[in-house]
Amino acid sequence: DSKNASFCFGQTMVICRLVVGKYPKYRDVIPQNNSNVLKINRSLLLNTVRRVSVCANKASNHIKFDLQSGSLEISAQDLGFSIAAYEKMQCQYDGEPLTIGFKSPFIIEILSNMNCGEIVMKFLDSKRAALILPAEEEEESGKICGIIMPIMIS
């Protein structure tokens, strides 16, 4: 019928309901002209975020990235339990010094689903979405990209 689509794969059948309307212009939400660029090993960043996020507040999962030329410091704290974690690592960073916050599960999710050695994170400022790409596909027209909204940090 005209309201559903079906797909058969061997003995499996998937039936989907068709949505009426115009598909959103998803390319319009991909940040463009980001002047601050971080290049780092994906697994190093992923493992560091996992370690540091253990000390993040369980309700908010906030972590903070402090970016300077040649270094990235990731930190998290839970004032209720008086715990904190800080890890500093070397990286390639081209841009102004920047402090930006993220929810750690979202960073972990994006990095876990990329199959590459190095990633590039592009930022405009601490209030706008960041773009995460495999370093091999640095062009925004690549096959995969992650977009993550920052959080307000104090």
Question: For each predicted feature, which ranges?
Answer:
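Short hinge/gating elements
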Residues: 29-33
